[in-house]
């Protein structure tokens, strides 16, 4: 992989670090230097996991329709008009690889610091474990976007992504196979497991033993390792109880605290510049006369999504709910969960659209177990029903394909806006068909070709293009993805 420039963005504090992040004399091989590098890596992880950086995976699917208010933000994704030379695609690719490069740099310096400061070895090893985790996580995110869904029977032939393990900004690495990519992910997870000793706690802002377990559950499901996916996911239930009230779900998104949260990266008034705002889901202005909001959204949920949220569901309101929308005659439905943390608002009624990235929460673990059980032996109703009843719905007795449909629908209800849908579609092999929200048709953009778009499960453009910059500057890379070779 070829980087656009030198690694930047480390949190230097008071250390003497040059602009290209070279060690400056007395600060070499010290815990305080590695600690500063660690801060920078956490900052980068906060940025790449921010919901503002996940919107394009949502716009690409059948969850949202673009409106005339979008200003074309995300429009190329919504219209499936991606090309290898798109700057947004290059930015996504570069953000992940920049973080990986920072990790590799920090790992080298941490190893050197252990030699020079053996009295700090325990803390430095913990930092190294966190860095291995971050590298595995970044590679996995790249694979989810730029590779096919993992198929154990074909992984040795499926195209992967470069997996740099040394600090070499100019390295020209081949993309390799998807089997090799996941081998690197699992190897880094093992390295993290051996070094991270921080025990899990609700709303942890750091990488913990439990965060690693949650990540293992995600990867195991992706690799069709269903027994381990079930074991990893279910091991987290007791420490992170499901929320079973509407107020509890509101607290998750408005207050940033929840018993379900396994890992949530911290954002404060001083650091919210690390993340972007998810304004286009709402763009609301407070109407003092009525005490309500008038919304001008760039993207609205599709009708089939709105229909999944019934009044008895505690997520109706906090996740998707009724809204007064500018220039439509009847009440519409909007995705409400990312209106922003109250504690980051400048005034009580001014929506800011800044939310702390919730990297792992236990609701996903129930859905992982349900899907893994279904894939393994056709079961899965028990964990699915546990989640449904916690959300105010009735449990399910569905079986067969009807059960799998219920699992899929629950994934939409629970994780709308959080960047899961594209990867779910690929893993399930179901294709997509858009279905415009009836109340909002008059403000939709792109015509029926966009808001009634249909894609078959085998459409190669479910995989995003490799940036042209990478292909042009890395002769060892290999092939462009199938959907973008002409």
Show where each model-derived region lies:
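Sec-dependent bacterial lipoprotein signal peptides
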Residues: 1-12
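Inward-facing hydrophobic residues that define packing positions of alpha-helical scaffold repeats
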Residues: 100-103, 182, 189, 233, ...
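Alpha-helical positions within canonical tetratricopeptide repeat
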Residues: 184, 228, 379-382
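Extended ligand-binding clefts on enzyme/binding-domain cores
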Residues: 223-224, 230-234, 238-350, 355, ...
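Conserved, well-structured interaction surfaces
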Residues: 73-146, 176, 194-197, 350-357, ...
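Short, surface-exposed recognition loops and adjoining beta-strand edges that mediate ligand/DNA contacts
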Residues: 23-28, 52-70, 147-157, 198-278, ...
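Membrane-proximal, proline-rich intrinsically disordered regions
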Residues: 13-61, 305-312, 435-486
């Amino acid at each position: 992989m070829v980087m656009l420039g030198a690694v930047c963005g480390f949190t230097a504090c008071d250390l003497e670090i040059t602009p290209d992040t070279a060690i400056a004399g007395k600060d070499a091989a010290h815990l305080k230097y590695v600690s500063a590098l660690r801060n920078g890596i956490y900052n980068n992880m906060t940025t790449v996991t921010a919901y503002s950086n996940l919107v394009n995976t949502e716009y690409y699917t059948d969850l949202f329709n673009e409106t005339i208010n979008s200003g074309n933000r995300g429009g190329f994704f919504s219209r499936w008009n991606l090309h290898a030379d798109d700057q947004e695609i290059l930015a996504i690719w570069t953000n992940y690889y920049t973080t990986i490069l920072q990790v590799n740099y920090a790992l080298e310096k941490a190893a050197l610091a252990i030699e020079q400061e053996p009295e700090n070895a325990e803390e430095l090893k913990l930092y190294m474990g966190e860095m291995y985790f971050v590298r595995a996580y970044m590679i996995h995110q790249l694979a989810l976007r730029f590779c096919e869904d993992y198929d154990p029977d074909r992984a040795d032939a499926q195209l992967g992504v470069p997996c740099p393990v040394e600090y070499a900004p100019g390295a020209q690495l081949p993309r390799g196979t998807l089997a090799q990519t996941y081998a690197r992910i699992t190897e880094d997870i093992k390295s993290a497991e051996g070094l991270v000793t921080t025990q899990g706690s609700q709303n942890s802002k750091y990488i913990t033993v439990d965060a690693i377990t949650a990540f293992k559950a995600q990867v195991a499901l992706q690799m069709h390792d269903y027994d381990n996916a079930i074991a990893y996911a279910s091991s987290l239930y007791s420490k992170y109880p499901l929320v079973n009230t509407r107020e509890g779900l509101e607290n998750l998104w408005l207050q940033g605290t929840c018993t379900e949260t396994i890992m949530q990266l911290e954002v404060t008034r001083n650091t919210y510049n690390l993340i972007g705002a998810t304004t286009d889901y709402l763009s609301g202005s407070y109407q003092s006369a009525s005490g309500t909001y008038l919304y001008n959204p760039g993207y609205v949920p599709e009708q089939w999504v709105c229909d999944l949220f019934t009044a008895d569901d505690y997520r109706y309101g906090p996740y998707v709910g009724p809204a007064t929308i500018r220039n439509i005659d009847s009440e519409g439905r909007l995705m409400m969960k990312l209106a922003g943390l109250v504690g980051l608002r400048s005034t009580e009624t001014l929506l800011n659209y800044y939310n702390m990235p919730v990297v792992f929460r236990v609701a996903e673990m129930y859905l992982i177990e349900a899907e893994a059980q279904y894939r393994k032996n056709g079961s899965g109703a028990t964990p699915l029903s546990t989640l449904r009843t916690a959300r105010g719905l009735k449990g399910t007795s569905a079986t067969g394909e009807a059960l799998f449909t219920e699992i899929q629908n629950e994934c939409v209800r629970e994780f709308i806006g959080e960047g899961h849908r594209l990867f779910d579609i690929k893993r399930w092999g179901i294709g997509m068909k858009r279905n415009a929200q009836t109340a909002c048709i008059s403000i939709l953009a792109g015509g029926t070709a966009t808001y009634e778009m249909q894609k078959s499960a085998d459409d190669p453009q479910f995989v995003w293009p490799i940036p042209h910059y990478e292909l042009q500057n890395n002769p060892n890379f290999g092939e462009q993805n199938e959907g973008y070779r002409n």
